[in-house]
Regions:
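Flexible phosphate-sensing "switch/lid" loops adjacent to ATP/NTP-binding sites
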Residues: 1-319
Length: 320
């Protein structure tokens, strides 16, 4: 079977569904007889996955590798940033921690060129064994202040010679502005690499959006390749976004209520996935004393900054 061009799923913002769509295409390409592999140059997430060599990568790439039917490897996510505080992250390179850096040093420091080379070399190693490579971007592709230091979105798409598909989330509103704005803020070179749009998380009757689809194509100058319905309980880990969905959880009378204390530097909340998928349980994250008092069970999760979170519990009275 002939080879395919590499493909990147970039986003109008964070949590628009890039990880899930990339996983879906890994499985589609696999079923079509190709040998795909996922790749994300740089990830920022508290949660990591241990490879067979006991090295760390982002959990999304581990899920995507499973969808592709291959073992996960650090080349799929060579740079992983694990937040330690509001301003500092642990830098994991090729699966191994190499130290902590504050945001300014990371984005402005001399080491950025070194990390860029490492990311490109990891991609090249992966591409030597798999085709196509299914790349995932990070956040928005339109962060103008970070463009010259970006190593995960359009610069990586150029290195991979990947066709870029822009993913937008219609469920959060503002789909026209987010898609059009993202396209218009691209340089001519970058804009030319974007070949189509996927509209994600659509609710309702698709036929009612036919006119909107045509408007987007006219405004953006590229085809809308598909509209993906809003999917419930798909069970695919999406980095840290699952917590944001449960930050405003509530007590349920017909279920066992499990309250997870929402620490400032909570780590590995995927530890609670086994509880979360049980229909008899209601898992939610909170710092509300009244909700904690009414819960059937309280869990204090792991922390990336134990002392700071212990002080937080004492200062807020949650330790009582």
């Amino acid at each position: 079977m002939k080879t395919l061009r590499n493909i990147m799923f970039a986003g109008t913002g964070s949590d628009v569904g890039k990880s899930v769509i990339a996983a879906a295409f890994c499985r589609i390409f696999r079923k079509d007889g190709y040998a795909p592999a996922p790749f994300k140059a740089q990830n920022m997430a508290l949660n990591s996955f241990a490879t067979i060599d006991n090295l760390e990568i982002g959990r999304a790439q581990a899920v995507q590798a499973e969808a592709a039917g291959i073992p996960c490897h650090t080349d799929m996510n060579p740079i992983l940033l694990k937040p330690q505080s509001d301003h500092t992250s642990q830098v994991v390179l090729n699966g191994k921690p190499i130290g902590n850096q504050d945001a300014y040093t990371y984005f402005r420091g001399q080491g950025k060129d070194y990390l860029r080379r490492e990311a490109c070399e990891a991609f090249d190693r992966l591409a030597a064994h798999y085709n196509p490579i299914v790349l995932e971007g990070a956040g928005s592709i339109s962060e103008l202040n970070l463009r010259d230091r970006d190593i995960v979105n359009m610069p990586m798409a150029h290195h991979a010679d990947a066709a870029v598909v822009l993913v937008g989330d219609i469920d959060r509103g503002g789909i026209f502005a987010s898609l059009y704005g993202s396209m218009m803020l691209q340089t001519p070179k970058d804009k030319n690499r974007i070949k189509g749009i996927i509209i994600n998380k659509f609710r309702g009757d698709l036929h009612l959006f036919d006119e909107g689809r045509q408007m987007i194509e006219h405004l953006c100058g590229v085809p809308v390749l598909g509209v993906v319905p809003y999917l419930h309980d798909i069970g695919i880990e999406q980095e840290d976004s699952v917590v944001t969905e449960k930050m405003h959880g509530r007590l349920m009378n017909d279920k066992v209520n499990i309250a997870v204390v929402r620490l400032r530097h909570m780590s590995n909340f995927t530890d609670f996935d086994a509880l979360d998928i049980n229909p008899r349980l209601n898992v939610f994250y909170t710092t509300d004393k009244q909700m904690l008092a009414q819960a059937d069970m309280i869990i204090i999760p792991g922390s990336k900054s134990t002392i700071d979170d212990m002080l937080f519990l004492r200062e807020t009275g949650l330790d009582q």
